[in-house]
């Protein structure tokens, strides 16, 4: 078991998230990624496949319970998971609301329950 501080990155297999994963590992964090690979790609993390300080969980953020072990003991959460693209959001508003709003609520509840010190939320303008 590592003594490194723990960071959670939602959407960590996406373009922005995977770069955050690289930076956090470089800065000495143990990183737990949750990404259902709907928009992200495992290939974005392929160069890290043998890194013992990286964990990839392919669940949807909407299934996280407040006491989920993924977030337990984490110091920081970087939340990048969500569905982008404007046109499909107009055609499928319920799915977008569920993934983007309720998914964020699930991640926030986990962070609150775990006593996370820093929560960073980022979203694209799409």
For the regions a protein language model found, what residue spans apply to each?
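N-terminal Rossmann-like NAD(P)+-binding domain of SDR-like oxidoreductases, especially those catalyzing
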Residues: 1-126
């Amino acid at each position: 078991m590592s003594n490194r501080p723990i960071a959670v990155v939602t959407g960590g297999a996406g373009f922005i998230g995977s770069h955050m994963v690289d930076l956090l590992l470089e800065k000495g964090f143990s990183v737990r990624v949750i990404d259902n690979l709907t928009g992200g790609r495992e290939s974005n993390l392929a160069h890290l496949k043998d890194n013992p300080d990286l964990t990839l969980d392919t669940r949807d953020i909407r299934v996280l319970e407040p006491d989920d072990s993924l977030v337990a003991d984490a110091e920081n959460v970087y939340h990048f998971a969500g569905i982008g693209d404007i046109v499909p959001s107009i055609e499928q508003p319920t799915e977008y609301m569920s993934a983007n709003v309720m998914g964020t609520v699930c991640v926030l509840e986990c962070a609150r329950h775990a006593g996370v010190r820093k929560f960073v939320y980022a979203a694209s303008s799409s």
